[in-house]
């Protein structure tokens, strides 16, 4: 589970920082949740949790549910937040985020 990789306390802080609609910033979130300093292997484990359909990619609908992977009661990202997140992570322009792209995004 995600709490094997990041702490409940850090999840609380990260979710608190994005509670307001439109406030999601992936760089701040990854820093607050403690992922920015984790290894590529840990980032890959988180990627595998986010990739709900196990396609090997995080698609736009999965990105919308991003916060709920950290806590089921968290809000859904808005379309604008989801699009910006996808654009930031999709370096090859295929409309989805692969594992290497996610690892780079976490470190950004």
Curated annotation (Swiss-Prot):
Superkingdom of origin: Eukaryota
GO CC annotations, alphabetized: cytoplasm
Binding-site list for Ca(2+) 2: 90, 92, 94, 96, 101
SUPFAM superfamilies documented for this protein: EF-hand (SSF47473)
Disulfide bonds: none
Function: In muscle, parvalbumin is thought to be involved in relaxation after contraction. It binds two calcium ions.
Family designation: Belongs to the parvalbumin family.
Note: This parvalbumin has an isoelectric point of 4.5.
UniProt name for this protein: Parvalbumin beta
Source species: Pelophylax lessonae
